[in-house]
């Protein structure tokens, strides 16, 4: 009898240890799930100031339609002097994409820089409201939060004048490798190259990530940093987003067939928006196309590329086909251009 009791006690002790071990494993698993993000964005934290102008305003101020120009704070205020502000809203290219991804139900994060000022605090609060994690690095310094003057002409095209402010100070120190490693995809924007020391920050983010993606951002941005961008696209990035003009400028061609040949050769995923001609994804020898939606009441093209990227990445990270991912990108892009502002 005594021997049976001892054996039972041993069994109970072993069972208790087993249950404890399983519980600890389950806790670790749940914690890991909690920490995991599908997509982490790294980009300029910018507040958009939206104004409507005519073409003469662009001509008189030496602005090229549909592009982004970097300005200092004084020039920004001078441009704004005689304009009526239609709307002020948190923006930034990758941040817009990340918010769109969050609205689609994805776990997302954002790394960017704002100042400890009114706009910076509002920016951070806005991302918190959209359930974006790890989203800002507030700096108490004299440089204000970045702002972008978005000028919308009657044809709904947008021309941007950006004062980067604190957003342009992002550096290697701001890239937390632990956070990067928690995400399935790290999504960066070409605009980051315009200020500061982005090369080390980019390399740190890309080397720590499972998959890396980047938007080429803007035609002039490509022309400013073509050599670096070409190296990134060919050797380091898994996914590249660009519009037709940007990707053609990158490889210095006027023939779109050259773009297709280039994308096939590098054997990466290249996703291209083509305006009225729809969108295209090229991966190895596979080419998939999606038609643009027709008969839209276009109000503002500001967030078209940002929300397209959000829709495509949503499909990609959730293992949808290239065709389905393109359709999702086209769907979101079509929605955003029928309103003013780059966030749904």
PLM-predicted stretches and their roles:
Residues 34-63, 86, 124-139, 143, ...:
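Ribokinase/PfkB-type carbohydrate-kinase core domain
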Residues 33-111, 121:
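Glycine-rich phosphate/adenosyl-contacting loop at the front of the ribokinase-like
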Residues 74-85, 130-131, 287-296:
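Glycine/charged-rich beta-loop-alpha catalytic/anionic-binding loops adjacent to active sites
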Residues 3, 9, 24-27:
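Charged/polar low-complexity intrinsically disordered segments
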Residues 102-103, 265, 269, 293-344:
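Conserved post-catalytic alpha-helical subdomain immediately downstream of the catalytic base
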